[in-house]
């Protein structure tokens, strides 16, 4: 009987631990100040592969004459190594415009994407940063809306973790609930009063998204 009880207890402990691990994976600690405690496993992988995303996206965009022309017209925005230390995004009103480079992100990796699109650019929309300290809120307006948190990381990068809201949805989905809606990227300063949010391997449409950010 003792062997049976020990086996049952061991199985119960394993089940509890597995359930706790699953709960953590589904519900990240969004109150943490360190982004590593918040980011999902999938988003940490996206961030680690940021340069791979740049290389693939630029190659795909340059393969089309129209995409190559857009890249050549703004070398600072589309240079992966164009990063200026200091002067991170402060609270205030901004304007944002997103460029989608390459294929179809997660769909492309799964082999279910349609043929790659070289480069798509969106219209300028209003965006804003709110709050003080090591964590600040960032949100954009428009049909496809980003909403999430900026985490201080280094003197040249801020980490963004958030979600994508679509159409007439009243509120953004909680982070960590849907891989396709989750967003993870770096905010980098690339010029005088000019930044970009780089999103490697997003869930929809592209290999890399580059959001240009300037004061309103």
Model feature map: region roles:
Residues 140-147, 163-168, 199-206:
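Short, solvent-exposed aromatic-acidic interface loops
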Residues 105-123, 160-186:
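An anionic, turn-rich surface loop/hairpin at beta-sheet edges
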Residues 146-153, 169-174, 206-212:
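A short, polar/proline- and glycine-enriched secondary-structure boundary/capping micro-motif
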Residues 88-158:
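Mid-length scaffold segments of soluble, non-membrane domains
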Residues 18-20:
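N-terminal signal peptide c-region/cleavage motif recognized by signal peptidases
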Residues 1-10:
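Bacterial N-terminal signal peptides that target proteins for export
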Residues 72-76, 175-187, 192-216:
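Edge beta-strand at a domain terminus
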Residues 22-89:
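Amphipathic/hydrophobic helical signal segments and adjacent flexible N-terminal regions
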């Amino acid at each position: 009987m003792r062997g049976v009880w020990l086996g049952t207890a061991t199985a119960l402990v394993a089940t509890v631990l597995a359930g706790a691990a699953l709960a953590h994976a589904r519900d990240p600690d969004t109150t943490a100040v360190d982004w590593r405690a918040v980011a999902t496993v999938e988003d940490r992988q996206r961030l680690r592969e940021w340069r791979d995303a740049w290389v693939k996206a630029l190659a795909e965009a340059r393969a089309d004459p129209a995409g190559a022309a857009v890249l050549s017209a703004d070398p600072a925005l589309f240079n992966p190594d164009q990063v200026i230390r200091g002067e991170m995004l402060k609270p205030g009103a901004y304007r944002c415009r997103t460029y989608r480079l390459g294929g179809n992100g997660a769909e492309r990796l799964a082999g279910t994407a349609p043929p790659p699109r070289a480069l798509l650019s969106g219209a300028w929309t209003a965006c804003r940063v709110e709050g003080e300290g090591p964590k600040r809120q960032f949100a954009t307006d428009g049909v496809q809306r980003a909403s999430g948190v900026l985490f201080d990381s280094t003197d040249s990068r801020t980490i963004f973790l958030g979600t994508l809201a679509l159409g007439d949805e009243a509120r953004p989905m909680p982070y960590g609930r849907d891989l396709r809606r989750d967003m993870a990227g770096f905010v980098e300063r690339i010029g005088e009063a000019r930044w970009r949010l780089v999103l490697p391997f997003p869930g929809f449409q592209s290999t890399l998204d580059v959001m240009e950010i300037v004061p309103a």
